[in-house]
């Protein structure tokens, strides 16, 4: 049942959120200003790559992904609306040397849809499977919504990295009636999505044996202000074998 929750999440988006998401594909993040302590989103090395078979005969390429912040300041988003009948508007709080400011973002939001009853940001990260022989994209990750928080220590030696979680629970992502929600990722911390979670997979049922690249990218559509947009992706090259097993051939750079 869990494997089909991606469809439920799409349905939960609704026409208003989908329209906002389409507009977001063409969004350009607000320019940075001098003195901004910007986040820098990226991905830790992909882990736990494996093929799982479902009871209805599908093959799922499962993996663990960790989005990380290696910048100078927190990655903090606020979701707000005037009433429960309004869609959430997203803004990013940017910390500075003297305080903070907020800039609007075209990021989409959705409540629930993946078995977790809280608010999510749509397309915070994306995964895709690519054939290495011809570069064709043959699969995409099912997971669409993300409630991110500090749950994985990544690089606490970075200046400004807290020793304990600052954004520690998705309980602050609220219920469906909330009007104001805060999500965040501290400097030096990551948010892990384990291979066993619902929707954390690419469906490879109809793929032939061969060599592929699994690529995971943070902020694919440039919806957020960062200090560096060139280090958002990581990948793993792998060989899918005829019996449904997988062999790792190599890893791309991580943040």
Give short role names for the model-derived ranges:
Residues 33-67, 71-76, 245-252:
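Boundary/junction segments of secreted and surface-exposed precursor proteins
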Residues 59, 63-118, 131-133:
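Short amphipathic, basic-aromatic surface patches that mediate peripheral association
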Residues 124-125, 131-206, 246-255:
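Exoplasmic/lumenal beta-rich domain surfaces
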Residues 207-218:
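A short tyrosine-centered beta-strand micro-motif
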Residues 226-255:
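Short beta-strand elements
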């Amino acid at each position: 049942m869990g494997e089909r929750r991606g469809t439920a999440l799409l349905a939960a988006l609704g026409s208003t959120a989908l329209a906002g998401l389409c507009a977001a594909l063409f969004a350009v993040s607000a320019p940075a200003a001098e003195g901004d302590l910007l986040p820098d989103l990226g991905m830790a090395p992909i882990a736990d790559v494996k093929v799982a078979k479902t009871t209805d005969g599908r093959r799922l390429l499962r993996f663990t992904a960790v989005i990380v912040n290696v910048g100078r300041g927190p990655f903090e988003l606020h979701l707000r609306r005037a009433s429960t009948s309004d869609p959430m508007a997203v803004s990013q709080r940017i910390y500075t040397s003297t305080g903070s400011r907020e800039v609007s973002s075209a990021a989409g939001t959705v409540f629930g849809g993946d078995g977790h009853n809280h608010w999510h940001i749509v397309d915070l990260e994306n995964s895709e499977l690519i054939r290495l022989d011809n570069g064709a994209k043959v699969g995409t990750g099912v997971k669409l919504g993300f409630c991110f928080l500090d749950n994985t220590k990544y690089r606490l030696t970075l200046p400004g990295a807290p020793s304990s979680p600052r954004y520690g629970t998705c309980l602050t992502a609220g219920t469906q009636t909330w009007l104001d929600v805060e999500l965040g990722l501290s400097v030096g911390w990551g948010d892990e999505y384990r291979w066993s979670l619902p929707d954390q997979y690419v469906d490879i049922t109809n793929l032939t044996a061969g060599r592929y690249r699994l690529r995971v990218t943070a902020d694919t559509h440039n919806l957020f202000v960062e200090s560096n947009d060139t280090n958002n992706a990581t990948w793993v090259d792998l060989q899918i074998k005829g019996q449904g097993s997988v062999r790792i051939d190599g890893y791309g750079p991580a943040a």
